[in-house]
Amino acid sequence: MAQLETRTEPMVVNFGPHHPSMHGVLRLVVTLDGENVIDCEPVIGYLHRGMEKIAENRTNVMYVPYVSRMDYAAGMFYEAIVVNAPERLANIVVPKRASYIRVLMLELNRIANHLLWLGPFLADVGAQTPFFYIFREREMIYDLWEAATGQRLINNNFFRIGGVACDLPYGWLEKCIDFCDWFAPKIDEYEKLITNNPIFKKRIEGLGTIERDQAINWSLSGPMLRASGVSWDLRKVDSYECYDDFEWEIASEKEGDCYARYRVRVQEMRQSLKIIRQACEMIPGGPTENLEAKRMATEDKKSEIFGMDYQYVAKKVAPTFKIPNGELYTRLESGKGEIGVFIQGNNEVTPWRFKIRAADLNNLQILPHILKGAKIADIMAILGSIDVIMGSVDR
């Protein structure tokens, strides 16, 4: 009996740029053989706004409000890196109290970032309920930010060259500790609901596996790198701000799959709580109301309570602050990985060159590699595990 010859042709499918699971205006041109992915080409640039060129035409004080719009889930991190670069270039020393306040804001932002990753990621793989839980917790972080900076999600405009815009308000540290006490059991609740859920584990275990050597060769960072067995965290490696004062551990896993990346982010939320608690207890001068009372009761103006480390800003930088001649690259660990700034000054109020390294752009580059051989139904789970925000990818 003669057999009919069957012939299959690859099919090209466009995901995005306005797909509900795209995490922004990202377009994936996917080539399929049946249900198997044989090629993937990410198309980026839909949200390009020229943030680097804007930086080169603004003073630092003018530019800080812009940067939180790059990654709306990590606004504090971008504010920090934008002021860290000229600080290091000009050798400006930040008071210890201001450094502690910065750490508090950064770690709250890390928790908020991971929460905003967790909800949509679980929705992508079919678990809708936790999506509503994460906004309950984020609301408390928003309240803390609003009390300290006046804004909630973006445009906090809180970091300054030499410190922060203002000291913490009365009762803020107490409210922050209350949040830690309230949020710690919520992480346990997430773990009971998700971590050992057989449906969830079956859905994402073994997906998007990245080996240790691959993670290093592709210049991955953050949870993407640590989930592949590399214990690399810039808070430990570079010891910026005052992270050396705290006891905490680097969260890492060895499997390198979507499930390992989930585990790393959950562990990081626990470690961030540990850092926040220590910072609230160890901040020089204690709560603002106590610090002001001590200053009023101290007649000796040379007392350490009036010293540099008890201030919230080292020096009021003038709007005409000139960035010194020279160049350097500075970096920090955000919720997504390493973000950095290469700055080149020429003794003018605006930088001559301002290059931004976004963590999620570098992490996104490995997507075509790990999608090859995967099923079409797994594309969204693998993409979601990377954690990209297109505002910072495109800049």
UniProtKB/Swiss-Prot annotation:
EC number, as in UniProt: 7.1.1.-
Domain of life: Bacteria
UniProt-listed InterPro entries: NADH_Q_OxRdtase_suD, NADH_UbQ_OxRdtase_49kDa_CS, NDH1_su_D/H, NiFe-Hase_large
Alphabetically ordered keywords of this record: Membrane, NAD, NADP, Plastoquinone, Quinone, Thylakoid, Translocase, Transport
Disulfide-bond pairs as recorded: none
Bilayer-spanning residue ranges: none
Keyword RNA-binding belongs to the record: no
Membrane topology: Peripheral membrane protein
Keyword field contains Zinc-finger: no
GO biological process: photosynthesis, light reaction
Subcellular localization(s) per the UniProt record: Cellular thylakoid membrane
Main location: membrane
GO MF, one annotated term: quinone binding
GO cellular component: plasma membrane-derived thylakoid membrane
Catalyzed reactions per annotation: a plastoquinone + NADH + (n+1) H(+)(in) = a plastoquinol + NAD(+) + n H(+)(out); a plastoquinone + NADPH + (n+1) H(+)(in) = a plastoquinol + NADP(+) + n H(+)(out)
Main function: NDH-1 shuttles electrons from an unknown electron donor, via FMN and iron-sulfur (Fe-S) centers, to quinones in the respiratory and/or the photosynthetic chain. The immediate electron acceptor for the enzyme in this species is believed to be plastoquinone. Couples the redox reaction to proton translocation, and thus conserves the redox energy in a proton gradient. Cyanobacterial NDH-1 also plays a role in inorganic carbon-concentration.
Quaternary state and interactors: NDH-1 can be composed of about 15 different subunits; different subcomplexes with different compositions have been identified which probably have different functions.
Family: Belongs to the complex I 49 kDa subunit family.
NCBIfam families: PRK06075.1, PRK07415.1
Stated name of the protein: NAD(P)H-quinone oxidoreductase subunit H
Species annotation: Prochlorococcus marinus subsp. pastoris (strain CCMP1986 / NIES-2087 / MED4)
Organism phylogeny: Bacteria, Bacillati, Cyanobacteriota, Cyanophyceae, Synechococcales
Gene: ndhH
